[in-house]
């Protein structure tokens, strides 16, 4: 079953009656109680402002959402609930029973993530020349949404005994546990647990998509039980994802299909400093060996794409020839053209975009290669499964005893690391939202909103 993600819609302001979930209890087969939640204790009152509006909220920060955390510092959430809902009040027509629950994560590069706050940024970074907008958390609160922002384990975490504790699928397990925590305490917590809206950017967008695609899947039940997650459902109402990194098994080929002709790069190196993700830009030019890898990956993409039997909204096949041209490329171009037309209609000056052809106020064509060249390459080939085991995704797919592993046959075959290992198929599969869509064992979120920046280089427009 193929789903056209761009046809999914999402309403952040939807409302519906809440359904009560189980009251606090012991997890079956365990003696440790699930984390408690008391709406009258453990919070601080604060004012949150955005867009000229101010709302008083109750803030619970550092709230554990599992009973046996592997990393207690990270497996916590920040919960913000408008005070009006404890007084029988309303915000924009929403009440304690009908307010949607906004679930933004702060995950970047599959690194460990702290819970978000009203003061911090939880959306995509602003475009060049634009000012930083208010945080999505602050905006959501002033519009009457309940906000639950979970922290999550990440790829760099290591226990004192040397065990790696944040490898795949740890972050997905944590987000699911957070959803279960909310449902577990639904009877005493304002907010509609049937209207949970996940949000994230880049790797966080990937995790948001994974959360929405894998609802209630039995594949992760053992991992959820191991950390002491609440029993019950973990499906959600809607997904909001900015430039999500998806379909990692095929993302290397997709990246070179788009960026293969771009030889210069500006890549981002990520590290952790004082529990904060640090980013540093590094510029350079591809070597001959890297170009050879790029060419091989680019050549492999059409065959994969054609196996998917993709079709546009009118039912027409979307395919590529051996050179990477065809109706699929035309379709991708049409999406960029439509976006440019929308910006033009809104008054944007696009005269500097030499790769656009504009006539009589209409965007009539796009030089795709020139457009991609203007965007520039961000990642070295292979973009995700590095042959030197040097990418964040290599570290993501490590194991409890091994820091980094390959996760594609191509990079394993071309590996530059003696003794390199390849991740098991199950782990790789669990981190691909496409695996769950169309399967009866998973409850897929009914509403999706996926956005990808015109000049975003984190992944290919194809995936």
Q: For each predicted feature, which ranges?
A:
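N-terminal secretory signal peptides and thylakoid transit peptides that target proteins
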Residues: 1-14
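Catalytic-loop region of hydrolases
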Residues: 26-98
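Short beta-strand element of the alpha/beta-hydrolase
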Residues: 97-108
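Cap/lid segment of the alpha/beta-hydrolase catalytic domain
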Residues: 107-172
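Alpha/beta-hydrolase active-site loop
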Residues: 166-187
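Non-catalytic, alpha-helical, charged scaffold/linker segments
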Residues: 253-372
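C-terminal subdomain of alpha/beta-hydrolase-fold enzymes, centered on the catalytic histidine
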Residues: 343-463
